[in-house]
């Protein structure tokens, strides 16, 4: 019973962390550094 409770708490913690990462995704070009572009919510380096 105790291991099940620990497993559920860990699963909830992981879900919250994943949710926070998705919320912090970039939405426009101004959120990334000068040499990066916002592509599909992720700051990617410019090529070239």
From Swiss-Prot:
Its main location: secreted. Leech salivary gland peptide with unknown function. Expressed in salivary glands. Highly expressed in the head, body and tail with a 2-3-fold higher expression in the head. The keyword Acetylation does not apply. Belongs to the annelide toxin family. Keywords: Amidation, Disulfide bond, Secreted, Signal. Residues 1-21 form the signal peptide. Does not show effect on voltage-gated calcium channels, potassium channels, and tetrodotoxin-sensitive sodium channels. Does not show activity on Nav1.7/SCN9A, and shows very weak activity on cation channel TRPA1. This is Peptide HSTX-VI. It is found in: Secreted. The keyword Cytoplasm does not apply. The modification Isoleucine amide is found at residue 47. GO terms for cellular component: extracellular region. Disulfide bonds join 26-38, 32-43. It comes from Haemadipsa sylvestris. Residues 22-27 form a propeptide.
């Amino acid at each position: 019973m105790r291991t099940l409770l620990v497993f559920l708490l860990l699963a909830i913690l992981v879900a919250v962390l994943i949710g926070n990462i998705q919320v912090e995704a970039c939405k426009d070009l101004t959120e990334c550094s000068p040499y990066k572009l916002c592509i599909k919510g992720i700051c990617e380096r410019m090529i070239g």
